[in-house]
UniProtKB/Swiss-Prot annotation:
Residues 129-190 form a coiled coil. GO terms for molecular function: DNA binding; zinc ion binding. This is Putative zinc finger matrin-type protein snu-23. It comes from Caenorhabditis elegans. It is found in: Nucleus. A zinc finger (Matrin-type) spans 90-120.
Length: 217
């Protein structure tokens, strides 16, 4: 019997014609349309591409001083070949951007995008009692250190003032000694003049003192 003459279970068992599951292919078509729409939205910027979440550290206090004063008052020659970091303003090497003024620069480095680029989240760690105690201890140590530094600075100022007073004292003493010597020489010269005035005129003439005589003849 030929294939086309078979019927019933025999015919169904030897059916080589491919069958289609309409429900399965309908769902696949819908999913394909959704994927195409999502890709188009991502391309147009209507939707962000799903990326694996990156574990970021908690927001921490900055451990360095932000340099806002080093370029104040300086002039810079800018050409087409000048790197972005030297074109004026404040350059952020993390985000590779230039901010023109200090206020916006601080807003930038404290902002979400900059913190994300350095691996930080905007969440802060909740402080425990131990953290608070440790913070108080650090602040106390800092104050004591600053107090000692202030005492050392005051001691140095006192030493410098004392050295300046000693220098002035020595200078005044030296000036007084010179004045005293001049006065002594002057007194000695006056005494010599008085002694000479008591000599006999003939003796004064013989000694060559006649020109200093003030007596009248």
């Amino acid at each position: 019997m030929s294939f086309y003459g078979q019927s019933g279970s025999q015919a169904s068992g030897t059916n080589h014609r491919r069958t289609w599951d309409e429900k399965e292919y309908s769902l696949a078509a819908q999913q394909r349309l959704l994927d195409e729409k999502e890709a188009e939205d991502i391309r147009l910027g209507k939707k962000k591409k799903d990326e694996p979440k990156v574990k970021r550290e908690m927001l921490q206090a900055r451990e360095y001083k932000v340099d806002l004063d080093s370029k104040v008052g300086k002039s810079v020659v800018i050409t087409k070949a000048t790197p972005s970091a030297e074109t004026g303003g404040f350059y952020c090497d993390v985000c590779d951007c230039v901010v023109k003024d200090s206020i916006n620069f601080l807003d930038h480095i404290n902002g979400k995008n900059h913190q994300r680029n350095i691996g930080m989240s905007m969440k802060t760690k909740k402080s425990t009692v131990a953290d608070v105690r440790e913070r108080f201890k650090l602040m106390k140590d800092k104050k004591e250190r600053e107090k000692k530094e202030a005492q050392v600075e005051q001691l140095l100022e006192d030493v410098q003032e004392e050295e300046a007073r000693m220098a002035d004292f020595k200078k005044d003493k030296k000036t007084d000694n010179r004045k005293r010597k001049r006065d002594t020489r002057k007194d000695e010269e006056e005494d010599d003049d008085e002694d000479d005035s008591g000599l006999d005129p003939e003796i004064r003439a013989m000694m060559g003192f006649s020109g200093f005589s003030t007596s009248k003849r």
